[in-house]
Structures are given as structure tokens and as C-alpha cells.
């Protein structure tokens, strides 16, 4: 078997729960709930939901329609996908992960419109967060890693954002550590002030903030994320480099970029030649960034795929991988005391702690 590109403990900060579901679990709940899937075998299902050559972001987003109806609105399914997510990450050598999701996309009650063509049920976005928390906590105990969550606002649904920030407040440090904004980057916050208001409330209440920006959208979306939404981290951020002044400013601020190499190839976010990927620029400039999978189910990937791409095509060394993970830990949304513990674990695993030799 090919050896892993980086066989040491890792930290992952940008991965979507609803893009990380085991195909077997989708098939199980589709059968149980009598929901029709495009195929009823793992191989058949993956032919519809997974892909290996670049598609547009719209085509990528359509993949969720194939399987989310089997999971959304089912208590057992929601708990199980959170638990199995922790199991999956533990197997990849991750010791700390922040997983993100939209509570509204898994609900079927008190959500307008009800997603995925579901009939109205009795699972509210609030209960979704509680169910995910239960699954994550159970997974933490079983697999001995730390998992926290980030709740997503959706750019096309600003009416949900107030509730998202309220749920962040309610479950703050009960696995939930931050708020995110995901979706179509062309929908800006001037036209959709609901997001800005939610982020203002997050700032006021000490809730950490990340924003998907500059993935397929221009550098102006990154500028808005930093200046208007007061983002502490940027999801993707590849197109930041197109505005040299903004890029220089964010380097000086030590802004963290959540980089997803394989994802950026498959969504057409970046040039298909990895040697021209913004992450190579980030590496050369000693920027603050991490390596992440984004949506492993749809991209047919594990964290090792992203690390292998970085090693083979972007000139990454073991030392750079260590630096990337230390930066990820430093930029995590954990409370300071837990962050120190996490960093100590990494320093120890990377042989960076000098023995006192009694």
C-alpha cells in the first residue's frame, strides 16, 4: 500500500457534514424511509453523487439533491452521520476537526421553505443542532479525537441567518464554536443585509466567524467578508491573490485561509495546473493556511488525497505539513486553554519538544 503523504496527527478546519456522509448510510436510511435514490448500491450511488473531473459549482450543488432527502428530517440519521463523521476523521489521523453544516438543511419543521421536497415533520433546526452534538460527542468518546462544529448561514436564505446566530449563542462551546456563510458568492451582503446583522450579533456575543469567500467569487467577496462581516478566517480565499493590496494586508493580519486543493480543482475554482494553485503562493509567502477536504463524499477523497496533491504537485515537504497543521491549531476556534493542549499534542507528535533529560 502506498505510504501516506503525512502520516502524523492532523487538524482539519473546513469540511461539510452533509458532504461527508457514508454511501452505505444513505442507502440504509433511504430503504428504511422508502425514499427513492438514483441507485441502490454503493457503486451505483457514487456514480451519481461523486465525480473526478471538474464540474461547475451549480452541477456540484445538484449532487446533494440525490441523497439529502434520505438523511434530512430523521433523528437517527442525523445523529449517525455526525458519529460516523468523527470515526472517518479519526481513521485519517485527525486529532481535532471543525465540521460545518446548515441546521436548516437537515430540518423539516419551522424552516421556510422546507428543504429537499420533504413533507413537514417535527425536527426543527434547533433539534438538528442537538442531534448533531449528540453524535459528535459519542464519536469523540469512541474514537478519542476532539470534534467541534460551525453553523452555516446560506447566502440565498438570509431569513435563516438570525436563527443561525441564535443557535450559535445557545450552543456556544457545546460543540458549536463559530458561524459560517456559504453558498452563491454573487449574492452580496449589501443586497442581503440579514447576513450582516447576524455577523454583527456574532461579534457582539464573542462568536467566532468564518466566511466562504474567493472560492469561485472575486477578491471583492473576500474584502467584504473581512471588512463587513469581520471574518477571522476565510473559507478557500483563492482569488484573494488577484488583489495584491488586499492579499498583502491579509498576510500582515495573519488571516487564516482554509484551503481545499482537490475540491478547488473539481469545482473549477482554480487553474487545473496545481503548480499554479494559490496554495503554492501561500506556501512561498509563509501565509497562515490549512489543508482540508471540503466534501469528501462528493469529491471521492480523504485528507491524504489533498496532502498527496500538495506533496506531488506543489512542492510541499514534511516541514511545511507540520507548519500547516500548527497554523490550523493556532487558528482553530477552540478556547485558549484547549488550543494550548492541542498545540502541545502536535509539538509532541512532531518531535518539536526538547526533552529535559533528567
UniProtKB/Swiss-Prot annotation:
Protein origin, superkingdom: Eukaryota
Bilayer topology: Peripheral membrane protein
Enzyme class: hydrolase
Pfam families xref list: A_deaminase
InterPro entries cross-referenced by the UniProt entry: A/AMP_deam_AS, A_deaminase, A_deaminase_dom, Ado/ade_deaminase, Metal_Hydrolase
Gene Ontology MF term list: 2'-deoxyadenosine deaminase activity; adenosine deaminase activity; zinc ion binding
Catalytic activity: adenosine + H2O + H(+) = inosine + NH4(+); 2'-deoxyadenosine + H2O + H(+) = 2'-deoxyinosine + NH4(+)
Record-linked PROSITE patterns: A_DEAMINASE
Cofactor binding, note field: Binds 1 zinc ion per subunit.
Site (described: Important for catalytic activity): 236
EC number(s) per entry: 3.5.4.4
Compartments, as annotated in UniProt: Cell membrane; Cell junction; Cytoplasmic vesicle lumen; Cytoplasm
Active-site positions on this chain: 215
Positions of substrate binding: 16, 18, 183, 295
Protein family membership: Belongs to the metallo-dependent hydrolases superfamily. Adenosine and AMP deaminases family.
Function: Catalyzes the hydrolytic deamination of adenosine and 2-deoxyadenosine. Plays an important role in purine metabolism and in adenosine homeostasis. Modulates signaling by extracellular adenosine, and so contributes indirectly to cellular signaling events. May act as a positive regulator of T-cell coactivation.
Protein name: Adenosine deaminase
Source organism of the structure: Xenopus tropicalis
Name of the gene encoding the protein in the UniProt record: ada
